[in-house]
């Protein structure tokens, strides 16, 4: 088997895992979107929140290898923030904005609500010039 054939075989062999990982990461991004839409309170969806799933701007390989980031731009009224997430074992690792980071193990509503609050707090702090170590997190 040539090196080229080995590459094609490997890509084919892990294609289902890649697809599953992409669905899970996009599930987190969609859950965050729903949580941000309801950040105004139950029954009061925010109409000025939108999400566009995009290729990760730092992506260097296509298709995306296992463990790499999946991304979306979130429009939060007057600003936009890039959120990147990847699956690391059974935990999601993510980053957003200039230096925001998060880890999530569950995709339930409570976890997504907590993540939405964290993103909103930290993005607000980024605009206010507050350093991440000054933030009071959960």
Where are these regions (language model features)?
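Mixed-charge, Lys/Arg-enriched low-complexity segments
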Residues: 1-11, 15-16, 125-135
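Alpha-helix boundary/N-cap detector
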Residues: 2, 16, 20-23, 27, ...
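Acidic-enriched, low-complexity/disordered segments with a strong bias for Aspartate over Glutamate
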Residues: 3-6, 52, 56, 106-113, ...
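Negatively charged, low-complexity tracts enriched in Asp/Glu with abundant Ser/Thr
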Residues: 9-73
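Generic hydrophobic secondary-structure signal
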Residues: 25, 29-32, 80-83, 119
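Short N-terminal secondary-structure initiator segments
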Residues: 34-53, 90-108, 119
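Intrinsically disordered, low-complexity regulatory segments enriched in Ser/Thr/Pro
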Residues: 60-115
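Extended, compositionally biased alpha-helical segments that mediate assembly or anchoring
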Residues: 95-97, 101-105, 113-138
